[in-house]
Amino acid sequence: TGKDGVVLATGGFGANAKMVQEYNTTGKWPDLSKTGTTNRFSASQGDGITMAKDAGASLTDMEQLQLLYLGNLVDGQISKFPARDVNGTDQIIFINKEGKRFVREDGRRDQICGGVLNQTDKMFYILESGDGAGYKDIKDPAWRSGDGFTFEYLEKNGFIVYADTLEELAKKLDMDPATLQATVDEFNKSVESGNDEFGRTLYSTKLEKGPWVATPRQACVHHTMGGVTIDPEARVLNEKGEVIKGLYAAGEVVGGIHGANRLGGNAVVDTVVFGKLSADTLLADTK
């Protein structure tokens, strides 16, 4: 019934395009009103933040928005792709529609997304070869993507482009084969020398043999670092810094936990720690 208190754990607002654009004020990102999201559309609408604000809660870091470059081109979800299941980050490169690299693949999320948004049609391909000890044959009938899809489904629906040779792949992607080959050759030189034109430092193998897989991706709104302000015990605070009695919060609905650029995986710790802490505090406050 909430008579003793309420814990807000309603998530962020990454799937609410209007709200995202309202707080997109730092100049870091272009207009995001039509940008996809990796969040489920029925969730991450910012409802909890809005309700808390109506109850007098202070908001923190609402302008801090994180994008992720792994959204598929259909609905923006981090799904339906073999990348990193076939090979790790150290064995892939990112290419634009012209067949050229444009960013360090082991860079920060915001830097990669900024690069993606400057490319033709604001998209790119994750390029993988048949090299590397971790390579998996995605045409094997037993193979499935991380979310359970077969090679046939992914290829038929355009989630991946597959070819036995790099030249064949370039033609399927409507790229100049010579340009794509030159891009791969230059990267392979970087693997040998350890000096990359974009500053990449993570390598493990050259890209030399087929089959080749290109996975089209886009930068999408992923995490919203802003939300309600809490004290160290997860009590929600008002604009004067005073505790709003009986109101607690945990997870992405809270602002000020991750700063301007959340590190991947840190939100898991955030939800676990403050989820327990908010419940413990509520119980302690009602004794």
Language-model features: locations:
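Short Gly/Pro-enriched turn/cap motifs at secondary-structure boundaries
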Residues: 39-40, 81-86, 117, 217-221, ...
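A glycine-rich dinucleotide-binding beta-alpha-beta segment and adjacent secondary-structure elements
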Residues: 179-261
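Glycine-rich phosphate/pyrophosphate-binding beta-alpha loops
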Residues: 67-72, 109-113, 220-225, 253-268
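C-terminal structured subdomain/cap of oxidoreductase catalytic cores
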Residues: 133-142, 153, 226-287
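Internal hydrophobic alpha-helix adjacent to the cofactor/substrate pocket in enzyme cavities
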Residues: 49-58, 176, 181-184, 271-287
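Short beta-alpha connecting loops at secondary-structure transitions
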Residues: 30-37, 76-81, 149-155, 259-266
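Glycine-rich loop(s) and the adjacent beta-strand/alpha-helix scaffold that form part
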Residues: 1-71, 274-277
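An anion/pyrophosphate-binding glycine-rich loop and adjacent beta-alpha core
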Residues: 49-51, 55-175
